[in-house]
């Protein structure tokens, strides 16, 4: 298996996910998948849309990994579940992020610029940890969550599946949302 990746979603979130992938220097971006943009159209950083979601099967020989760059949690879950029947989900961590010891990060999760995930935290599958988010030690973040820019999750807190935080939202230690 190689390191070729496709980004599913060519909107605003796709831009920051693309930047995170480029910062990692781990994957080779083959292009984007987007249901609302014609195949062949150049969209972000001179990458083209190479398929629509309903034609992911055609990418099996061109791409090894995928990452979903769609902000809506429910839609992101649906696309993630479909895509992982065909391709391998990637985990994308921006090079400026800080990841503590014994942290577990699920498949399909994106950790964006200047975020911090402290020791023994667990982050589920297909999660957006947006820029400058802090997840303190021993937190549990569910699946298909979107922690918006600047969210601060205090130690030993739990964030349930499908939760979306507000920009700059703060959760005290031992909280549950």
Regions found by a protein language model. Name each.
Residues 9, 66, 89, 136-137:
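Generic structural signal for conserved hydrophobic packing positions in ordered secondary structure
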């Amino acid at each position: 298996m190689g390191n070729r990746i496709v980004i599913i979603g060519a909107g605003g979130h796709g831009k920051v996910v693309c930047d995170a992938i480029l910062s990692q220097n781990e994957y080779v971006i083959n292009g984007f998948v987007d249901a609302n943009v014609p195949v062949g159209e150049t969209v972000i950083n001179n990458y083209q849309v190479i398929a629509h979601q309903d034609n992911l099967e055609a990418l099996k020989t061109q791409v090894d990994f995928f990452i979903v760059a769609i902000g809506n949690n429910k839609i992101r879950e649906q696309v993630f579940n479909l895509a992982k029947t065909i391709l391998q989900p990637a985990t994308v961590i921006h090079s400026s992020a800080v990841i503590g010891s014994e942290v577990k990060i699920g498949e399909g999760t994106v950790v964006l610029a200047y975020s911090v995930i402290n020791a023994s935290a667990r982050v589920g599958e297909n999660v957006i940890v947006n820029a400058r988010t802090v997840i303190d030690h021993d937190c549990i973040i569910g699946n298909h969550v979107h922690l918006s820019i600047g969210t601060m999750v205090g130690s030993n807190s739990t964030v349930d599946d499908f939760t979306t935080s507000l920009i700059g939202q703060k959760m005290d230690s031992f909280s549950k949302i």
